[in-house]
């Protein structure tokens, strides 16, 4: 596995949450699992998140995946993880108000105009010393 279970789980906590609020807390996840009839202790979830426990059961992975509305394969299948992680990165990017405003303004422009916007952004990134 290219990344640890803890890193993958924390990525979900950091990025998968409803609009208009911040990330879920461990207590919220435990309460939601309990409402589904699944028992998970706060110390156990903390150990999973810190990397002190590294081999959760399939049932635990399925319960956490269900909470975050993803497939449990996220935790075990590197190819699926990489695919979903790209989507999570996009989600993080689009949460930035400035990026969202640029995307909204570029929407509907002809392809040639969109390319000009991209070219200008690349110029600005180079000027700022950011990889384009």
UniProtKB/Swiss-Prot annotation:
Reported induction: Negatively autoregulated. Transcriptionally regulated by the MprB/MprA and PhoP/PhoR two-component systems. Expression is growth phase-dependent, peaking in the stationary phase. Probably induced upon phagocytosis.
Knocked-out gene: effects: Mutants exhibit growth defect during infection of mice. They establish a stable infection by three weeks, but the bacterial burden is an order of magnitude less than the wild-type.
Main location: cytoplasm
Cell compartments where the protein resides: Cytoplasm, Nucleoid
DNA-binding region location: 38-50
GO molecular function, one term: identical protein binding
Entry superkingdom: Bacteria
Phenotype when changing residue 125 to A: Moderate impact on protein stability. Does not affect DNA binding
Keyword Transcription among record annotations: yes
Gene Ontology biological-process entries: positive regulation of DNA-templated transcription; regulation of protein secretion; response to host immune response
Family annotation (InterPro entries): Cro/C1-type_HTH, Lambda_DNA-bd_dom_sf
Effect after changing residue 71 to A: Decreases affinity for DNA. Does not affect dimerization
Effect caused by changing residue 69 to A: Affects protein stability. Decreases affinity for DNA and dimerization capacity
Any single Gene Ontology cellular-component annotation: plasma membrane
Protein keywords: Activator, Cytoplasm, DNA-binding, Repressor, Transcription, Transcription regulation, Virulence
Binding partners and assembly: Homodimer. Binds DNA as a dimer of dimers.
Comment on protein domains: The N-terminal domain binds DNA and the C-terminal domain is involved in dimerization. Both domains are required for transcriptional activity and for ESX-1 function.
Function, in words: Virulence regulator that has both architectural and regulatory roles. Impacts cell wall functions and pathogenesis through regulation of multiple genes, including the espACD operon, which is a key ESX-1 component. Influences target gene expression positively or negatively, depending on its binding position relative to the genes it controls. Acts by binding directly to the DNA. May play a central role in regulating virulence gene expression.
Protein name in the entry: Nucleoid-associated protein EspR
Lineage, highest ranks first: Bacteria, Bacillati, Actinomycetota, Actinomycetes, Mycobacteriales
